[in-house]
């Protein structure tokens, strides 16, 4: 009868879930699921200096996330840039119960070795000094917190002080929900910061990467 069919379907789903590798197993494995529906692929065929985190299949060419420090190494050249310190903001301004937000921040910082989702750099490319910032989607999806917004404003200030172009690599979502309207205000301030760069007749280049969502494209990007 129909009840037996539902129970059987549920059991099949449980068995399929058990067969899937855990996050820890996927992270430690040399193999990863293919982005274009083929058999599993070796990570080293995608994450290398030639492919630069892009699928080698000509019919796919899927772009995987690119951590900021790796991106800066590729753009400026290794040891040819410096990481700029950014303002620190007290965590969890809305005091979420059970420290749920603080725990998420702690896990993201351990995973990425970053204070927030945005990293700022100053370096040289072909003899030209350039300021840049990059968003790390591994840090709570690349969501923009108050501290992330302050980091972007710092990048704008550094560009103006040093009279350099400002380049942004946008990868992530919009404002972080754990800070509600406060993070929304921060994103508004980033627009003002970028406008100051433009008022100083300095080039501002935003590069959309995978994945980039509406909150970012509606503000500083």
What are these regions (language model features)?
Residues 207-213:
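Glycine-rich beta-to-alpha transition loops that act as phosphate-gripper elements at the mouths
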Residues 213-220:
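Short glycine/serine/threonine-rich phosphate/pyrophosphate-binding segments
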Residues 1-202, 211:
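Terminal-region recognition feature
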């Amino acid at each position: 009868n129909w009840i037996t069919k539902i129970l059987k379907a549920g059991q099949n789903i449980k068995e399929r879930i058990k067969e899937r590798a855990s996050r820890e197993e996927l992270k430690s494995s040399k193999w990863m699921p293919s982005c274009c529906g083929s058999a599993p692929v070796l990570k080293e065929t995608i994450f290398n200096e030639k492919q630069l985190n892009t699928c080698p299949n000509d019919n796919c060419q899927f772009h995987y996330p690119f951590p900021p420090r790796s991106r800066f190494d590729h753009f400026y050249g290794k040891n040819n840039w410096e990481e700029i310190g950014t303002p620190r903001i007290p965590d969890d301004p809305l005091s979420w119960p059970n420290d749920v937000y603080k725990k998420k921040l702690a896990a993201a910082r351990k995973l990425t070795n970053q204070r927030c989702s945005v990293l700022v750099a100053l370096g040289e490319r072909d003899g030209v000094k350039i300021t840049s910032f990059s968003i790390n989607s591994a840090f709570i999806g690349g969501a923009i917190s108050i501290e992330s917004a302050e980091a972007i404003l710092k990048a704008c200030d550094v560009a103006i002080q040093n009279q350099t172009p400002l380049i942004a690599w946008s990868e992530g979502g919009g404002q972080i929900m754990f800070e509600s309207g406060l993070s929304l205000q921060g994103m508004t301030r980033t627009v003002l910061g970028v406008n100051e760069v433009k008022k100083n007749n300095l080039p501002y280049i935003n590069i959309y990467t995978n994945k980039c969502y509406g909150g970012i494209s509606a503000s500083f990007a």
